[in-house]
Regions:
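Terminal, compositionally biased segments used for targeting/anchoring and flexible tails
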Residues: 1-119
């Protein structure tokens, strides 16, 4: 599908729960964790069981959600790059790499967005 719909999305947005990333350990094995933003995904990746991380990582679910729902093709590609070298990484090293890449991307997006007003 060639589309420009991702270009109009703000990757820092919070999506509705129905579009959130739902963690599973296996098909039909929902663990009750849903993420509705990149920040929530990075946080959840540090806490969920390694079986859930591996399940989704091997299927390409993280990249697909980031690309199709969040609208961040660049981060999805960075996750694809981790997948390509994953045979050399342990499960925990892979988890750490995913979290690091997501957090770096969040910072890049926040800087690009400019200063915000907190109040």
């Amino acid at each position: 599908m060639v589309g420009s719909s991702n270009e109009t999305k703000d990757p820092l947005t919070v999506v509705p729960r129905a579009q959130g990333f739902h963690f599973y350990k296996a098909i039909g094995g929902c663990i009750g964790v849903t993420c509705c933003s990149l920040e929530e995904l990075a946080d959840a990746l540090q806490k969920v069981c390694s079986e859930a991380v591996i399940f989704h990582f091997e299927r390409g679910d993280f990249q697909n959600w980031i690309r199709d729902i969040i609208g961040d093709n660049e981060l999805a590609q960075r996750i694809d790059d981790v997948k390509m070298c994953s045979r050399q990484l342990s499960g925990e090293a892979c988890r750490k790499e995913l979290v690091e890449r997501i957090n770096v991307r969040i910072l890049q997006l926040e800087v690009a967005k400019g200063p915000s007003v907190f109040g």
